[in-house]
């Protein structure tokens, strides 16, 4: 099924049909919708290889995630990967998972960049001072950070207000009368972990309370379980526990 047939049926040019199907922003939403509906009705599938040659794209996005801790054991992370993959697939774009070891001399994501094997990168579990983002920014390669970092220039990022979450939770417990409040936090320097820890600590300082029940533990159920046992065995155990991830909560 050719573009000419779609163009003839809709009474528009082949160029307009092509630009609509390839996502150009100079095509109106109404025209794009008509073209996509007609293409779907006819079972039209674009020649992906030809489109890649013409557009100079790979039609692939890489998702960079750390080897340690193992985020693939986290159901929330897996759900996020599934949603990203689903949305990209709607635009005929593949998602490549790239495990990155920050202790390695060479990084897989840079091989992808240098070999032009992806069009862009999504970098998950960012660090507060992240050399990966700095390297990508210096190279001019397009990326989206899932988390915030300290970079010299503005960059695209998506994140939750991690600081506000633990700060509000801690304040709520204080208002309920708790004075010995624990936090089970992950034991690494990823940006969201530091933000959650700081929210907890600042809320305690506001109330003049001790942070003696702060614990940094592996992001596993066992880590949460063992840390909770240790806290409950203290002469003055906490009366409330905040966890910064679902696996800690399961263990607690």
Give residue ranges: language-model regions.
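N-terminal helix-turn-helix DNA-binding module of bacterial transcription factors
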Residues: 1-59
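A general structural signal for well-ordered alpha-helical segments in protein cores
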Residues: 3, 14, 32, 50, ...
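Acidic active-site catalytic centers that drive phospho-/nucleotidyl reactions
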Residues: 5, 19, 119, 161-162, ...
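Bacterial carbohydrate/catabolite-sensing allosteric modules
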Residues: 9, 41, 83-91, 137-145, ...
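Short beta-strand segments enriched in small/hydrophobic residues
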Residues: 16, 55-70, 172, 180-187
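Short glycine-/small-residue-rich Rossmann-like dinucleotide-binding loops
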Residues: 22, 126, 246
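Residues at secondary-structure transition points
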Residues: 26, 30, 48, 52, ...
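Alpha-helical recognition/docking segments in bacterial nutrient-uptake
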Residues: 60-171, 175, 231-233
């Amino acid at each position: 099924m050719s573009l000419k047939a779609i163009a003839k049926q809709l009474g528009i040019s082949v160029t307009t049909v092509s630009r609509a199907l390839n996502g150009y922003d100079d095509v109106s939403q109404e025209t794009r919708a008509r073209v996509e509906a007609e293409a779907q009705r006819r079972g039209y599938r674009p020649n992906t290889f030809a489109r890649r040659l013409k557009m100079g794209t790979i039609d692939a996005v890489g998702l960079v995630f750390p080897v340690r801790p193992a985020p693939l054991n986290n159901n929330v992370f897996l759900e996020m990967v599934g949603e990203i993959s689903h949305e990209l697939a709607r635009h005929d774009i593949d998602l490549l998972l790239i495990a990155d070891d920050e202790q390695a001399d060479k990084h897989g994501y840079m091989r992808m960049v240098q070999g032009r094997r992806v069009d862009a990168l999504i970098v998950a579990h960012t660090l507060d001072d992240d050399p990966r983002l700095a390297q990508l920014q210096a190279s001019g390669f397009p990326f989206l950070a899932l988390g915030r970092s300290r970079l010299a220039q503005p960059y695209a990022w998506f994140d939750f207000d991690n600081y506000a979450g633990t700060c509000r939770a801690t304040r709520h417990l204080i208002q309920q009368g708790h004075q010995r409040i624990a936090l089970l936090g992950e034991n690494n320097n990823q940006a969201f972990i530091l933000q959650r820890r700081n929210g907890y600590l600042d809320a305690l300082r506001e109330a003049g309370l001790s942070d003696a029940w702060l614990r940094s533990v592996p992001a596993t159920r066992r880590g949460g379980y063992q840390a909770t046992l240790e806290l409950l065995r203290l002469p003055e155990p906490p009366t409330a526990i905040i966890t910064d991830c679902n696996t800690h909560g399961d263990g607690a």
